[in-house]
Amino acid sequence: MNPNNRSEHDTIKTTENNEVPTNHVQYPLAETPNPTLEDLNYKEFLRMTADNNTEALDSSTTKDVIQKGISVVGDLLGVVGFPFGGALVSFYTNFLNTIWPSEDPWKAFMEQVEALMDQKIADYAKNKALAELQGLQNNVEDYVSALSSWQKNPVSSRNPHSQGRIRELFSQAESHFRNSMPSFAISGYEVLFLTTYAQAANTHLFLLKDAQIYGEEWGYEKEDIAEFYKRQLKLTQEYTDHCVKWYNVGLDKLRGSSYESWVNFNRYRREMTLTVLDLIALFPLYDVRLYPKEVKTELTRDVLTDPIVGVNNLRGYGTTFSNIENYIRKPHLFDYLHRIQFHTRFQPGYYGNDSFNYWSGNYVSTRPSIGSNDIITSPFYGNKSSEPVQNLEFNGEKVYRAVANTNLAVWPSAVYSGVTKVEFSQYNDQTDEASTQTYDSKRNVGAVSWDSIDQLPPETTDEPLEKGYSHQLNYVMCFLMQGSRGTIPVLTWTHKSVDFFNMIDSKKITQLPLVKAYKLQSGASVVAGPRFTGGDIIQCTENGSAATIYVTPDVSYSQKYRARIHYASTSQITFTLSLDGAPFNQYYFDKTINKGDTLTYNSFNLASFSTPFELSGNNLQIGVTGLSAGDKVYIDKIEFIPVN
């Protein structure tokens, strides 16, 4: 049994030390080993490296697009479920100010994907989409204005005329979305329009739910309200599957063999996660019949920032696509950054004063989700030290920013790159204190050339960064450049919504991804999520206890809950829930898929338990029975619904 599901795939062969001699040349050689460097003096070298140290692909426009996507998701996480009163109008207002102050954000959404795919949308298609978006903006603004007035007016002043007016504006906006969505999925441009499609789909679904909240007040017949609900369910599935399909198509097109192709591949994966996949993970929560209360949920997926390098064009020395992709961590139980041990080596320089020390390799230690005291230490990445090691301990504090210095040297006839210093900004949300820790190679550290905020901007700029940040660091890897020309660190981040303590809210519906379990039993493993779950999922192939997750109830309020499990299964099964080993809920649930089926939105169902329970313990076990040979059960989340 491998209780933490951390197995052979985490093993990376440690490279040999390949010590660099420290008796380096302090001044330029009388005879240059490389003829191309004969006439290159030190100032020219510095100018050359400075010119090559500008990251052209991370433009301010791209950063702004990503920030808007992150901001929309962050705002939604604060209102999903059933927001009452002014909270809904306030969200609409903020949302419109974010993505619809003009047509410029929508143009930027399109240009972002055009840059990633190195392909342009034809003018006719772009102009048609922008025209549709302008019409949608007008409709939505008119509807939100009417909704605001409706909420402000006393019930006694609401009459058939005002009811008819808001029904008219709602129906106009809703039907305009249905008619416009094909303009964001024009054949041949589906990938390039994907961010636009996802944002428009999100607005449509969020709008549709209002019929369930206000439909009766507005004077709709029950049959009309039911029809809107049926449409919402159908479009949630349609929009989700469209986004997943075309995300995958775009990602597959960018697979390559070189380091440069991996950088672009990873940028697409990261940026489309932030602007598309994170968004569609929230679509089901707009179903106010299933979620009649506010919802506390989390995004547990990982995103990787660009490698930290001192030059843009590594000219074939930046390792290979497969070398990086194959060694990225495979699906695993969620964990938190605990410690990084930095190894440092010396890089001599042809000009003497361009010599530097650099981050040559590292171990990283993590801790599983609450419930276990284990510390998991990674295999070694990179080259081991010729200098003293440095240990930075984070102990679960949230590292929300990394700023790196890099340097370059010529030795003896080629350019070497290294990361010389990294400042980590961290925040303790228990004490409300911000601080920094620094890896410092302590020799010729060069200039700042990389900042994680450029790629993972904050949710909001209205708060200090330690409060408004969007992501926290949870893993660090280091890859060797070809020809031993240095190392390339790559940092992994997760969303700030993740709750270390797995707190169960006594007033909200709490969703806990099962990937936050601290222990898996035989036959249970972590597999890649199907893109729309906000993270990876658990697969069970054997009968018995599947996973144990630690939960922290709200002890300030005595509350009972009902449980639901978001699952897919190839057979009819029985789920059993136990607290500290004592079963309290058990029921059988239907098969949802056939063996071999690809997981799509409709593959999953909710297993609802009717018997309320109190959280009298902390260790929640989920058991599965009813599986035969070849059967599989996939578990995404468990939900805790307060019983009033």
From Swiss-Prot:
Q: Which keywords appear in this protein's UniProt record, sorted alphabetically?
A: Sporulation, Toxin, Virulence
The terms under GO molecular function for this entry are: signaling receptor binding; toxin activity
Q: For the region Disordered, what residue ranges are annotated?
A: 1-20
**Which residues of the precursor form the propeptide?**
1-57
The record, for SUPFAM superfamilies, names:
delta-Endotoxin (insectocide), middle domain (SSF51096), delta-Endotoxin (insectocide), N-terminal domain (SSF56849), Galactose-binding domain-like (SSF49785)
GO-annotated biological processes = sporulation resulting in formation of a cellular spore; symbiont-mediated killing of host cell
Composition bias, kind Basic and acidic residues: at what positions? 1-13
The job of this chain, per UniProt, is described as:
Promotes colloidosmotic lysis by binding to the midgut epithelial cells of Coleoptera.
Other information: Toxic segment of the protein is located in the N-terminus.
Family indicated by similarity: Belongs to the delta endotoxin family.
PANTHER family for the chain: ENDOTOXIN_N DOMAIN-CONTAINING PROTEIN-RELATED, PESTICIDAL CRYSTAL PROTEIN N-TERMINAL DOMAIN-CONTAINING PROTEIN
Q: What is this protein called?
A: Pesticidal crystal protein Cry3Aa
Upper taxonomic classification of the species?
Bacteria, Bacillati, Bacillota, Bacilli, Bacillales
Q: Gene symbol?
A: cry3Aa
